[in-house]
Amino acid sequence: AMYSQAYISVSGGYGFKAHEKTLGRDASNPTATTDLKGSYGEGYQAQLRGGYFFHKRWGAELALGYLHGEDMPTNKNQVLNMKGHGRAYGASLSLVFNITDNLYVRAGGVTKIGGKTEIQTELNAKLPLRMFNPMAPATTMVDMKADFNNNFHGKIPFGFIGGIGYRFKVADKVAFFIEGEYLNINVPRKESKLKDFSATRTIAGTTSAISLQEFKTYMATLQNAPASPQTAALKQLATQISPLLEDTYSWEGKGAPDAPYSSIGVHFGVTYTF
């Protein structure tokens, strides 16, 4: 086993979602709304680690990691489709214990040091033009489409990381390893930033681009529409997306749920011992 020795290792693998939380709701079928659960921690993972064994059995390890997360559906209904993914950099400090020369376990603390949760929103709504223009004919509809992205940034989180692995020597100072890793961490939401906004409206077959400010005006009109069974869902929709239309929006104190980043992953890697 490594004894009073330093080492570095690189690894790559895939993390599967764990400790799923509700990311949003699927109301595609208005009579049966379901929760959309998941974890932004699902996706491809890479790590660079450095460690030192100060005893035949015990060592300490510092690791830097990157997550390229898979798309997760976050909200869905008849006019809205939202999905999100994580792009995150993390750091961890762990104790490593050699059970045998080949088998080891590690456990420690982990935090995120950079990255974002990216949410993509597509809106496609057919609305009575009269909602926005009282003089419009009762039958005229406006077809409104919008596409935009938001980058969500969080506060510094702290979580637990642990793993069990098996290493086998392939040369004097080189070993391959395979390991299972458990990560439990949630990122408190801090702020979101709008990017890549585009929108159009189509009235009587004529399509024109509309600005962010015009689109915000449409949403404000929906929010202020008289309450009725016909407008309830639209009012809720406008209220839901209005924070996402701000260039920068602070979520602090708004009761926003933490973003889940937990995973159970499998990694393959190589270690070089000095």
Segments from the language model and where they lie:
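Predominantly the C-terminal beta-signal and adjacent terminal strand-loop region
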Residues: K169-F274
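Surface-exposed loop/turn segments flanking beta-strands in extracellular/periplasmic regions
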Residues: P30-A32, P128-P137, A199-A209
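Feature marks short, surface-exposed loop/turn motifs that line or immediately flank catalytic pockets
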Residues: Y14-E20, H68-E70, I113-G115, N184-N186
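Short glycine/proline- and aromatic-enriched beta-strand/turn motifs that initiate or cap beta-hairpins
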Residues: Y3-A63, L67, L127-P128, A256-T273
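Outer-membrane beta-barrel translocator domains and adjoining extracellular loop/strand segments
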Residues: E20-N29, M72-V79, T117-K126, R189-F197
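Extracellular loop and loop/strand-boundary signature of outer-membrane beta-barrel proteins
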Residues: S28-K37, K76-G84, K145-F152, E252-A256
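Gram-negative (and chloroplast) outer-membrane scaffold detector with strong preference
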Residues: Y7, R49-K145, H153-F160, F168-K173, ...
